[in-house]
Curated annotation (Swiss-Prot):
Source organism of this protein record: Hahella chejuensis (strain KCTC 2396)
Assembly: Part of the 50S ribosomal subunit. Forms a cluster with proteins L14 and L19.
GO CC annotation terms, alphabetical: cytosolic large ribosomal subunit
Protein family: Belongs to the universal ribosomal protein uL3 family.
Full protein name: Large ribosomal subunit protein uL3
Annotated region described as Disordered, given as residue ranges: 135-155
Length: 212
């Protein structure tokens, strides 16, 4: 896996192509991403870099993390994220180095991970797109009910993974193979075609696409 970035979802807008076609884009504000740790094959058993992004009050940093940042000599960040390096990545990374939006370029495909908007406890129609049952014809209390959830005495249980009512959203989600439309190095912005997980202001992780 190649190195990525941690950014903040700033919202959505649109750009216009030369032929006038509107392209919906998500604007991601990339704050300073600083390398806080470099993991090596000899010491840690695998190669990776750990980056920290954003800013946070000193009172909001626990003692183990405060010591970790102090040892690295970097300012404590709001988010800590690790990127595993593969054998083809021969770049030399040092603690304290900054990773900027220039690691991506317009036209590149990326995967964006974030925490989806929480919708609370939802029924099967909203959560799983089930069809409603009859409004009339003798149906009185089961208009939005799921219906049968199993078989008979065999197997005598409900199978794991059965689509039922429950907590919707508020999960880690990755949207794959999104196109980078524009990179603004001066303002630290990434404009990515389409929607990405999370609410405005949420932290997202952008990595080169694994399926590109």
């Amino acid at each position: 896996m190649a190195i990525g970035l941690v950014g903040r979802k700033a919202g959505m807008t649109r750009l216009f192509e030369d032929d006038g076609a509107a392209v919906p884009v998500t604007v991601i504000q990339v704050e300073k991403n600083v390398i806080a740790q470099v993991k090596s094959l000899e010491v840690d058993g695998y190669r990776a870099i750990q980056v920290t992004s954003g800013s946070v009050k000193a009172s909001r940093v626990n003692k183990p993390m405060a010591g970790h940042f102090a040892k690295a000599g970097v300012e404590a960040g709001r988010v800590v994220c690790e990127f595993t390096l593969d054998a083809t990545d021969s770049a030399e990374y040092k603690v304290g180095d900054e990773v900027s939006v220039t690691i991506f370029e317009a036209g590149q495909k990326v995967d964006v991970s974030g925490r989806s908007k929480g919708k609370g406890f939802a029924g099967v129609i909203k959560r799983w797109n089930f069809s409603t049952q009859d409004a009339t014809h003798g149906n009185s209390l089961s208009h939005r009910a799921p219906g049968s959830i199993g078989q008979n005495q065999s197997p005598g249980r409900v199978f794991k993974g059965k689509k039922m009512a429950g907590q919707m959203g508020n999960k880690n989600v990755t949207v794959q193979t999104l196109k980078v439309v524009r990179v603004d190095e001066e303002k630290g912005l990434l404009l990515i075609k389409g929607a990405v997980p999370g609410a405005t202001g949420a932290d997202v992780v952008i990595k080169p696409a694994v399926k590109a």
